[in-house]
A protein has these predicted regions:
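Conserved, helical-rich catalytic subdomain that frames metal- and/or nucleotide-binding sites
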Residues: 2, 7-112, 148-160
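Short hydrophobic/aromatic beta-strand micro-patches
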Residues: 29, 123-127
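Short amphipathic alpha-helical segments
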Residues: 39-41, 127, 136-137
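Conserved SAM-binding loop
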Residues: 114-115, 124
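RNase H-like, two-metal
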Residues: 130-160
C-alpha cells in the first residue's frame, strides 16, 4: 500500500494515516545490533524504578493527536515537536553513544532525532531535502554513514 500508517501490536497491524507534504529523514544505522528483548527488559526496569505497577492501566496505543495533526499538515517543524519513542530512554541506557548521534544530528541541523523502534538505528527529521543532505555531510565528517529517505511514498506497484 505504501504511504503513512499507524502500526500497533508488534507493528504488524497497520492502519493508513493521512500525511501531506514531504518529510525528509536521515537514518543512521549502527554496525552493532541492539537486542529488542534487552531493551524491553530495561524499559520494564525503568518503569518499575519510577513506581509503575503491573496493575496500572495499560499504556494507550492511540497515536497522540498532535502527531496526526502534524502529519496532516505536512509541517516537519510541527512533527518535530510531537514525535517520541517510548523505548528511546531504555535503548539509550543500553547504548549511550546513540544519544551522541542524535545530538550530532541536531547540531548539524536536524529538527529532531529519535531512536527507531528498539534501536539501534537513529532517525533524524530534517526540514528539507537540502537540510537532510547537510546533516548527512556533517555526520560523515564524524565517520557516520547514513541514508536520506523521504515519505510518504507509494507502495510497490506493477508497472507492466
Amino acid at each position: 500500500h505504501g504511504g503513512t500508517a499507524v502500526g500497533t501490536g508488534r507493528g504488524d497491524q497497520l492502519n493508513p494515516a493521512l500525511a501531506r507534504g514531504r518529510f525528509d529523514w536521515v537514518l543512521v544505522p549502527s554496525d552493532e545490533g541492539l537486542s529488542t528483548p534487552v531493551v524491553y527488559a530495561r524499559l520494564d526496569a525503568l518503569r518499575d524504578a519510577e513506581g509503575a505497577l503491573a496493575d496500572d492501566p495499560p499504556l494507550s496505543l492511540e497515536v497522540p493527536a498532535p502527531v496526526l495533526q502534524a502529519l496532516r499538515s505536512g509541517d516537519p517543524d510541527l512533527l518535530s515537536e510531537s514525535i517520541y519513542n517510548d523505548l528511546q530512554e531504555a535503548a539509550l541506557h543500553e547504548r549511550p553513544e546513540l544519544e551522541t548521534t542524535i545530538l550530532r544530528g541536531i547540531h548539524a541541523g536536524a529538527l529532531q532525532g529519535i531512536v527507531s523502534g528498539s534501536g539501534p538505528t537513529v532517525a533524524l527529521l530534517c526540514a528539507s531535502p537540502e537540510g537532510a543532505q547537510e546533516v548527512q555531510s556533517l555526520l560523515r565528517e564524524h565517520g557516520l554513514e547514513s541514508l536520506h529517505v523521504h515519505g510518504p511514498v507509494p507502495g510497490a506497484r506493477i508497472l507492466a
